[in-house]
Regions:
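Intrinsic-disorder/low-complexity accessory segments
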Residues: 1-151, 166
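An acidic, glycine-rich "communication" segment
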Residues: 28-29, 156, 160-180
Length: 180
């Protein structure tokens, strides 16, 4: 325990050693049917991927900042990696500000005429073309289905912000052209 305690002190993390009886009590509380929790015992550190475009955005991704600060290793993956079948090599996938509908995100209304936003649109169109798609929305639907298959295969998915809505909209719009 001493190595872990020293590491916590160095990082400014408060920790407490508990007895087996205390651990058992905590587990019993978690296993109550009216509690929305579960116990997950990690046998190994999960291999984490963060789905994010390769070009920098003006807003920060809080998750990559937190992972970097905590010194938790992760890889950044985007459409090329997903389309190449790399997702099953990861245990965990994180989605954040992505727009899986091909409508270029929630920032379109305010930032569509900004140079950095136009560059982002052009980059997405270029990636779609490179991967053989006529439209970004077609690429993003295929990416969404690959993410769905990753989860169905046992992968963990954590989505937040606009990724949650746009992921569902993308799947719901299958066979419907929702983009000009």
């Amino acid at each position: 325990h001493q190595v872990f305690e020293e590491e916590c002190v160095v990082r400014g993390v408060t920790s407490q050693v508990i007895t087996d009886v205390q651990a058992s009590s905590i587990k019993q509380q978690i296993l109550q049917p009216d509690v929305n929790m579960d116990i997950i015992e990690l046998q190994k550190a999960p291999r984490i991927a963060v789905y994010s475009p390769k070009n920098r955005q003006p807003w920060d991704d809080a998750v990559t900042l937190a992972l970097t600060y905590a010194e938790i290793p992760y890889d950044v993956v985007y459409d090329h990696e997903v389309m190449s079948g790399m997702l099953p090599t990861y245990d965990w996938l994180h989605l954040h500000h992505e727009d899986f509908t091909g409508q270029y995100g929630k920032f379109w209304a305010h930032y569509r005429n900004y140079p950095w936003y136009k560059e982002d649109v052009a980059a997405n169109e270029e990636i779609a073309s490179e991967l053989g798609f006529k439209k970004v929305s077609e690429l993003k639907l295929t990416v969404t289905k690959k993410i769905r298959d990753f989860v169905l295969g046992g992968g963990y998915l954590f989505a937040m912000c606009s990724a949650t809505d746009s992921y569902d909209v993308s799947l719901a719009a299958d066979n419907i052209d929702i983009c000009d």
